[in-house]
Amino acid sequence: MAKRGGKRTVGVPYRFHVTPGIFMNSLVPVADNSGAKLVRVIGVVGHYSKSVHRRIPGAGVGDMVVVVVREGKPELRKQIFRAIVVRQRRPYRRPDGTWVAFEDNAVVIVTPEGDPKGSEIHGPVAMEATLRWPTIANLASIVV
């Protein structure tokens, strides 16, 4: 007989389905004071790129992506980091039925464990990102 109930992963108590709005090779501004200004998405953590019909990996709010710094401090440029998507232009639907869309796309540079490299986040942060990554919620000034 099949097991009842879904699997829960440790460290990710909230996992909402968010419509992907940021894809491979997207140029995305950085919303923290880590020194990077513009990054290019080169991968999505947890997404196998050669899966369904070679589909291009996409990330939504709250997802971790692999990025390379394109503009910013010289010591950060051409370096590969991980980042969390905190805003996206693409509208997505919340479980209560409301639709959310931001004015711009934005990411926050983090360590591989998920701790932010900067000490402050500029602009609003989506609720889905703060529920999934509590350390980002501590730095967020506005949560939408």
Swiss-Prot record:
The signal sequence is: none
Q: Does the keyword Ribosomal protein apply?
A: yes
SMART domains cross-referenced by the UniProt entry: Ribosomal_L14 (SM01374)
Transmembrane region positions? none
Q: Which GO terms describe its biological process?
A: translation
Q: Where is it found, in Gene Ontology cellular component terms?
A: cytosolic large ribosomal subunit
Q: What does this protein do?
A: Binds to 23S rRNA. Forms part of two intersubunit bridges in the 70S ribosome.
Give the protein name, as stated in the record.
Answer: Large ribosomal subunit protein uL14
Q: Which organism is it from?
A: Pyrobaculum calidifontis (strain DSM 21063 / JCM 11548 / VA1)
Q: Which gene encodes it?
A: rpl14
